[in-house]
Regions:
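Aromatic-lined, polymer-binding surfaces characteristic
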Residues: 38-40, 46, 50-53, 59-299, ...
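Short, solvent-exposed loop/turn elements at domain surfaces
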Residues: 47-50, 58, 400, 408-410, ...
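Flexible, surface-exposed loop/gating regions in the mature catalytic domains
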Residues: 201, 388, 488
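Carbohydrate-active enzyme catalytic cores, enriched for enzymes
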Residues: 256-443, 494-495, 607-614, 629-704
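CBM-like, beta-strand-rich accessory domains located in the C-terminal region of large
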Residues: 360, 450-704
Length: 704
């Protein structure tokens, strides 16, 4: 034995052990007897399983795709050499492991007996070559390694399933040789997990660990299997404890969430099916979060090192068939997860795949998405939209304001307010930023991951900087720059019909404090209130990005105009900025929603040498030109900043000050923030104050 089962935790306890994430029981559980097949199904399930492969169009398409992966007419390639190009080596190991898995599945569920036998022979041939070539001569720690540990997790799971399918047909001699090959790689991963990723427990630790866990369950009678599984659980728990919030937010961003999902979803099925350990309930908040945070297209945000991603919740829907969920008053979680995927617009990702060959998982060379879709699909599941309140306030720090779960029509609104504790990997300087989607179009945007790769110089020169996000800097410093497990505190939250909002706070180190409130008013427009409290002199900069639109100016109003594209229909965003003693300038910055689809677009930078009075930004989405909507800004130096908005027969006043008396449009108060919305008769529809001792509206005392 190279290691005991005791924890090997090299991470600082004050950072990696203290976040709100989750873990599954660390004690490894293996079956009393190794049995095959068992990872995805049992032998007794084969007849029923084959019927599901043609149950509907979705299943038939995935079955066809799986059969294409198992091409008996395609000769096997020779193993690459140690000096071959990185891409050649990487693609070889991915393709060989996928082919082994596909042929093995076809050997059980393919056509007639002769065809199945041919697939079985091919699968055996592939398994007897598993991990041939230079893999053990190459170092996974090398930057850009062809055998990076993040790939090895998928290769392990592919070979595990292949062996699981054909093991009962193997001769003792072939079985011994194949087990030796698979065990060698499992032992290599076991010994090197913490060498490859010695510090932060990010996805480079968890992905190979989930693969190691699957192989341990496959070779459960191996003398080292218990140790492999223990190490896998230990390492993956480090990741889920630190990078996930208790309510499911993944702090490396949507891209790495889906990238990791390609390994943890198979492991969850394998552990449940082989050992009877059901960890799906522990992971439930992750899949609920995907539904809670998705926009009207069904896309997860491109926050942190991320591109837009769909919600592949269909992969686990069947596992939650009878699970109660906060997302619906009566329907099980399985129906909500089925709905979320069925109502995801996959067209941008299919367009990307058609051009580049890459699917949305980030693991296209290593992970056969269609095969897992085939094995997890249940055509009998209903699709039911959530009937929970559409506005979501996650304790992990993300807030979503939306008009409905399903609407993508005119009047559609979605704003994500991001205030999550900063993790130490794939982070961007985006604290308290926001993303706006409205009228079905992406408007106020996050600039995204990079043009196409982690290694691209533009990623650190632009994409992960504060200027690429809808956020602020003070004296050149972004908010909450350093890793922390402290979620930005919420100062207040208001939830009224017609007025919803929240204020979160952050710091610019010891230099200044920042409070940002975002209000959604009349189900229509948004107002952002920024209050900075300097502790020393410094320049404040605010950045406002309008997505893939052209920018024009009409007096105090800025207008982003969007053409119909793969991200949404034609639309406009009308914006006003009220920032006393500050200068607003137009700049250009690059934006990427989908890998490779990048271009420069205009954004606004507001700069103030001194910050004395709150800054306000008003955002009014529209399908086209404004109709009966006017905005007037009011500024009183060192006292308050305000917007007076007339929309149809309604008038709304939003003002923010320094606790000095405000008297405006019949409103009198000493509040730091006040919002009053009235109809044509003067009736108050909404009113809100923050830190006020009095409020009078049209001479009537509201407070005290």
């Amino acid at each position: 034995m190279l290691e005991t089962l005791s924890a090997r935790d090299q991470a600082p306890a004050d950072l990696y052990q203290s976040y709100s994430g989750f873990v599954i029981p660390a004690a490894p559980v293996l079956p009393a007897q190794e049995t095959h097949p068992s990872l995805w199904f049992k032998a007794a399930d084969l007849s029923a399983l084959k019927v599901t492969f043609t149950a509907d169009d979705f299943a038939r398409a995935r079955w066809t795709a799986t059969q294409k992966l198992a091409d008996l007419g395609k000769p096997l390639p020779p193993a690459p050499g140690v000096k071959d190009k990185t891409e050649v080596i990487h693609k070889y190991y991915g393709a060989m492991s996928i082919a082994a898995r596909a042929h093995a599945l076809l050997s059980l569920l393919g056509g007639d007996e002769l065809v199945r036998a041919a697939h079985c022979r091919r699968a055996e041939e592939l398994l007897l070559r598993a991990y041939d070539g230079p893999i053990f001569q190459l170092d996974s720690k090398d930057k850009g390694s062809a055998v990076d540990e993040i790939y090895r997790g998928s290769w392990l799971q592919n070979y595990a399933h292949a062996y699981d399918c054909i093991q009962p047909t193997l001769s003792p001699e072939a079985d011994k040789l194949i087990r030796e090959r698979l065990a060698r790689e499992a032992q290599c991963v076991y010994e090197n997990l913490y060498e490859w990723t010695p510090d932060s427990p990010h996805n480079h630790l968890s992905k190979p660990a989930w693969g190691l866990g699957s192989m341990a369950l496959t070779l459960s009678s191996h003398p080292q299997a218990k140790f492999w599984l223990a190490r896998a659980l230990e390492a993956t728990n480090k990741n889920t404890r630190y990078f996930f919030s208790g309510d499911g937010i993944y702090r490396e961003g949507s891209h790495y969430l889906v990238f990791s999902l390609t390994n943890f979803v198979p492991f969850l099925y394998h552990y449940r099916n082989v050992s009877g350990v059901d960890a799906f309930p522990t992971f439930q908040p992750v899949f609920e979060m995907m539904v809670q945070v998705r926009n009207s297209h069904g896309w997860l945000p491109n926050i942190e090192d991320s591109y837009l991603r769909p919600t592949p919740t269909h992969l686990v829907a069947a596992a939650y068939r009878d699970r109660v969920t906060k997302l619906h008053s009566s329907a099980p979680l399985s129906e909500i997860l089925t709905w979320s995927y069925q109502h995801s617009d996959l067209s941008p990702f299919e367009q990307e795949r058609g051009g580049s060959g890459f699917n949305y998982t980030g693991a296209s060379w290593d992970y056969p998405l269609e095969l897992d879709e085939l094995l997890t699909h249940d055509a009998t599941l209903r699709a039911t939209a959530s009937n929970a309140a559409p506005n979501v306030f996650l304790a992990g720090g993300q807030t979503v304001l939306r008009n409905s779960w399903a609407s993508a029509d005119a009047g559609q609104r979605y704003l994500l307010f991001h205030g999550v504790a900063v993790a130490d990997n794939h982070n961007h300087d985006d604290q308290l930023s926001f993303i706006l989607e409205a009228e079905g179009q992406l408007m106020c945007s996050d600039s995204g991951y990079s043009r196409g790769t982690y290694a691209g110089a533009e990623r650190t020169a632009w994409y992960n900087t504060a200027a690429a996000h809808n956020t602020l800097t003070f004296d050149g410093r972004p908010a909450d720059k350093d890793p922390t497990n402290a979620t930005p505190p919420v100062s207040f939250r208001v939830e009224q019909p017609g007025l919803v909002g929240e204020e979160k706070s952050a710091t610019f180190g010891p230099k200044a404090a920042w409070h940002r409130a975002i209000f959604w008013i009349a189900g229509d427009f948004f107002v952002v209130v920024d209050r900075v409290e300097p502790k020393q002199p410094g320049e404040t900069k605010a950045y406002l990005h309008g997505g893939r639109g052209t920018l024009t100016t009409d007096g105090p109003r800025r207008i982003w105009t969007y053409s119909a594209d793969r991200y949404g229909p034609a639309a406009k965003l009308h914006a006003w900025i009220a920032a006393p003693e500050a200068l607003v300038t137009e700049k250009s910055g690059e934006l990427t929603y989908i890998k490779g689809d990048y271009a420069p677009f205009p954004y606004l930078e507001t700069t103030g040498a001194h910050f004395f009075t709150p800054w306000l930004t008003l955002l009014k989405p529209a399908a086209g030109e404004l109709q009966d909507f006017t905005v007037r800004s009011e500024k009183a130096a060192n006292q308050h900043t305000a917007f007076v908005v007339r929309s149809g027969q309604e008038k709304t006043v939003i003002a923010a000050g320094n606790r000095a008396a405000i008297s405006l449009e019949g409103i009198e108060t000493d509040a730091e923030i006040v919002v009053v919305r009235r109809d044509a008769t003067g009736k108050i529809l909404n009113q809100f104050v923050h830190h006020a001792t009095y409020l009078r509206v049209d001479g009537h005392a509201i407070l005290p």
